[in-house]
Every structure is written in C-alpha cells, then in structure tokens.
Regions:
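A preference for well-ordered globular domain cores
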Residues: 1-117
C-alpha cells in the first residue's frame, strides 16, 4: 500500500532527479552549445579564473557538439555567468517545487515536468 508519505518521497526524488538532469543537460550561449556536467563546470571555472586574471586570455573550447571555438576572456566570463544562472535557475525551481509536493499542491510527475520546462 502506497502511503501519502511514500508518494511525497517518490515525487521529491523524481523532482531532484529532474533538477539534476536539467542542470547537467547543457545550455546554448551565443549559439555555442555548452556542456554543464560537473566536469565541464570545473573547466569553465578554471577558464574563468584565467580570463579574470588576463583580459587578453583566449582559449580553444570544444563545445557540447564537438565544434571548436576560440573564446576570448569576455566570452569565457559570459559563458561562466550563463552556466551559473542556469544552475541557479534549476535550484530555484526545485526550491519552489519541493514545498509544493509536501503541501500536496503538486501531486504528479507531469506537474514537476511542467515546472522544469
């Protein structure tokens, strides 16, 4: 027998998985598909540190579709900012969805899917 508590736990786990999949699913910044998995986020942060230290910094970057782009310091910083905004948006959506699951306002996976877009 599935209890309400089981349903809430299952829906919260589903929402957490949905958040994670969206977070690591990648984004497009100025036409360049950017990977947002944990390794890629570390590489982006490293490039950002170099870009902040040297405004003339450039680096070849392999995009999520395997195309190669030479990025300037400003482009690296813009990509880093976009990735941060993407991740923060995923967390913000989950922070809105989780209490709605607990309150019963969200009672199914379709509502969670809709919240995450």
């Amino acid at each position: 027998v599935l209890t309400y508590g089981d349903l809430v736990t299952d829906l919260k786990a589903y929402a957490a998985d949905k958040r994670w999949r969206k977070e690591v699913g990648g984004i497009v910044v100025n036409g360049v598909p950017i990977a947002t998995d944990d390794r890629s986020k570390q590489m982006i942060m490293g490039a950002r540190l170099a870009a902040e230290a040297d405004p003339n910094f450039t680096t070849p970057w392999v995009a999520n579709d395997n195309s190669v782009h030479t990025l300037s310091a400003a482009e690296v910083i813009a990509i880093s900012n976009a990735v941060l905004a993407h991740v923060a948006g995923c967390f913000a959506t989950y922070a809105t969805v989780a209490p709605q699951i607990e309150s019963g306002a969200i009672a199914g996976a379709a509502q969670i899917d809709a919240a995450f877009g």
